[in-house]
């Protein structure tokens, strides 16, 4: 499944695509778990294991695609009025994606363990030593040499067949792919961790701005209070001056009136 970059820069469509992928990842994880439960039962078959591998790889690709979509969503331009709502939406998508990835990685690890157990059983039944064969040609040459020098020996438990080798190499290839996919998911978790960290920085910045705003408000209130006090004192002083002037005028008027009479 290939990644289709963007949806015309429309945040609503991009958010819908992300939500849809998250739902698919969750559903695929459930299906992978159901398939894992069938391994080692009468329903187990090479076809079932192939379906398991394909489903796992498809889900892994969905996870990579969703990671890119979320990054794109976070980089979309936004107006100040939309910023808060956009951040809430992104936080929700990141949280849902993290939950779905956690469940997916859990079944990934289970699948890898099942494959390793299968290889171990085949090796044990075929008397194959070592963990992972580095050179399959050596084992094939060994089988050929044993078949030529001991054609009469037909003890199945002590021989490794071509089918055994094929199964071992297929399963080991599957294990390596699973481990690589698990590492891919780990990288996505790191990306999500960085997003959460950046969101924390934004929150810290917002809180700092709020605190600064509160300080400025307090300072402004103090300045207003001082201004009000000054204004009250000014009015009081003005009233006293006016009163003195009135009294002075009255005294002068009385003196003038007395002189005239």
UniProtKB/Swiss-Prot annotation:
Q: Which residues lie on this side of the membrane: Cytoplasmic?
A: 2-238
One GO CC term, this protein: endocytic vesicle
Give any Pfam family that matches. Syntaxin_2
Task: Tell me which tissues or organs this protein is expressed in.
Answer: Highest expression is found in placenta followed by heart, skeletal muscle, kidney and brain. Low expression is found in pancreas, lung and liver.
- Membrane-related topology note: Single-pass type IV membrane protein
Q: Tell me which family the UniProt entry assigns to this protein.
A: Belongs to the syntaxin family.
Kindly provide the name given to this protein in its UniProt entry: Syntaxin-7
Q: Which organism is it from?
A: Homo sapiens (Human)
In the UniProt record, the gene name given for this protein reads: STX7
């Amino acid at each position: 499944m290939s990644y289709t970059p963007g949806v015309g820069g429309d945040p609503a469509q991009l958010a819908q695509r992300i939500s849809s992928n998250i739902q698919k990842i969750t559903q695929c994880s459930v299906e992978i778990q159901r398939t894992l439960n069938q391994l080692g039962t009468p329903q187990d078959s090479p076809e079932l294991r192939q379906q398991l591998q394909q489903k796992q790889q498809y889900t892994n690709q969905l996870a990579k695609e969703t990671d890119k979509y979320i990054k794109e969503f976070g980089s979309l331009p936004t107006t100040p009025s939309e910023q808060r709502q956009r951040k809430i939406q992104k936080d929700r998508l990141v949280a849902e994606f993290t939950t779905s990835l956690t469940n997916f990685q859990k079944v990934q690890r289970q699948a890898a363990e099942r494959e390793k157990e299968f290889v171990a059983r085949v090796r044990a039944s075929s008397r194959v030593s070592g963990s992972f064969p580095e050179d399959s040609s050596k084992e094939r040459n060994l089988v050929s040499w044993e078949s030529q020098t001991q054609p009469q020996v037909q003890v199945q438990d002590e021989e490794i067949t071509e089918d055994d080798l094929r199964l071992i190499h297929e399963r080991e290839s599957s294990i390596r792919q699973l481990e690589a996919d698990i590492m891919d998911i780990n990288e996505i978790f790191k990306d999500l961790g960085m997003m959460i960290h950046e969101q924390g920085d934004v929150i810290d910045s917002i809180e700092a701005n709020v605190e600064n705003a509160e300080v400025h408000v307090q300072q402004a209130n103090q300045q207003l209070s001082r201004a009000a006090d000054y204004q009250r004192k000014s009015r009081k002083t003005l009233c006293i001056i006016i009163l003195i002037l009135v009294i002075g005028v009255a005294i002068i008027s009385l003196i003038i009136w007395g002189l005239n009479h």
